[in-house]
């Protein structure tokens, strides 16, 4: 995310998802007085500078460094017909696990959580690691955790999550530069766990989650160049479930499925796919980070250590299927 520090405030430049979110929420709050924006000591996560907080008025609440209270507040507002949107950095969401489970998800209150910097390439000191949110959030019952790949998909998911009244919804905001899809995206995500096939091929299927969709595109291209394999590329969109219909379809003309996720492997998205195929002949390779605490790491070294470069992934694929 492109940001700079000015005094005690962060200034947000135009081309990042904080700015995209600010513009959307300011407009949405004017249109619908039920919408309330919440932060917990980090208003810059949503791009809410002092002038924007003043513009939002009573529809903006910063609770201070109290993520637990932020989630409980969002749950209570949602339970009473409001439309709360809570923005938080991935590294801080673990502080509110009790409230996510006991207050929000048990009651199935339709609050919205926007999780920023959920990525291996975010903050890199050991107390601010940003890649444990997928197993933490996605395994709580009733929660719907979404992983958009571009600006249009993100805004469509955000609009739907505020409009719907059935589930608590978290969105893993892309940890990339703002990317435009250049094509229409769905506006209704209520038919849960339906993945999107971005390119249909055969033999190898690449499930590239959220911010790692670009890595999936690179692997797709490199497989074609190196081995003339026209693979299938899938945008899962939903972190919290498996598209069993699509996964069953792949069995007909695929022998290998790989998953790519910008986070820790243990308890993550890829393991759901591996478990689904466990009793079949389909081979599965999961790519993500090892479960460990790392400190002041170099991102390129971390990616290489976890076989997360396109060259390494293609090498692994070809070693399995020739």
Regions from the PLM with identified roles:
Residues 9, 55-61, 82-89, 120, ...:
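Short, basic, glycine/proline-bearing loop/turn elements
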Residues 1-7, 12:
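Single conserved hydrophobic/aromatic residue that forms the stacking wall/gate
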Residues 80-82, 107-111, 116-164, 316:
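Conserved thiamine diphosphate
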Residues 60, 69-77, 82-87, 96, ...:
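Extended, hydrophobic alpha-helical segments in both membrane/secreted and soluble proteins
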Residues 36-38, 59, 80-91, 111-114, ...:
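A short, small-residue-rich loop immediately preceding and capping a beta-strand
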Residues 73-77, 103, 136-137, 160, ...:
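Hydrophobic/aromatic ligand-binding patch that stacks against planar heteroaromatic rings
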Residues 18-24, 30-55, 62, 68-71, ...:
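Thiamine diphosphate
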């Amino acid at each position: 995310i492109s940001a700079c520090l000015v005094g005690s405030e962060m200034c947000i430049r135009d081309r990042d998802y904080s700015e995209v979110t600010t513009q959307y929420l300011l407009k949405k709050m004017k249109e619908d007085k039920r919408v309330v924006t919440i932060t917990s000591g980090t208003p810059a996560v949503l791009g809410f500078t002092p002038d924007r907080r003043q513009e939002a008025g009573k529809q903006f609440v910063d609770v201070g460094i109290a993520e637990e209270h932020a989630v409980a507040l969002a749950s209570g507002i949602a339970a009473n017909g409001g439309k709360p949107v809570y923005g938080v950095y991935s590294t801080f969401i673990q502080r509110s696990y009790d409230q996510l489970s006991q207050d929000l998800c048990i009651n199935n209150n339709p609050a919205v959580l926007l999780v920023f910097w959920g990525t291996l390439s975010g903050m890199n000191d050991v107390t601010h690691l940003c890649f444990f949110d997928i197993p933490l959030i996605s395994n709580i019952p009733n929660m719907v955790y979404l992983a958009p790949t571009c600006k249009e998909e993100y805004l469509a998911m955000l609009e739907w999550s505020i409009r719907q009244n059935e589930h608590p919804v978290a969105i893993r905001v892309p940890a990339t530069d703002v990317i435009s899809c250049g094509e229409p995206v769905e506006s209704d995500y209520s038919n849960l766990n339906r993945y999107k096939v971005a390119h249909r091929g055969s033999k190898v299927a690449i499930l590239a989650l959220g911010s790692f969709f670009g890595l999936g595109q690179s692997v797709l291209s490199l497989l074609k160049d190196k081995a003339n394999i026209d693979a299938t590329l899938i945008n899962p969109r939903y972190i919290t479930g498996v598209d069993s219909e699509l996964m069953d379809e792949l069995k007909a003309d695929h022998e290998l499925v790989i998953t790519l996720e910008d986070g820790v492997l243990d308890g993550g998205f890829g393991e759901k796919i591996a478990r689904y195929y466990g009793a079949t002949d389909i081979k599965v390779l999961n790519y993500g980070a090892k479960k460990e605490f790392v400190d002041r790491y170099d991102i390129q070294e971390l990616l290489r250590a976890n076989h997360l470069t396109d060259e390494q992934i293609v090498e692994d694929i070809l070693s399995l299927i020739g």
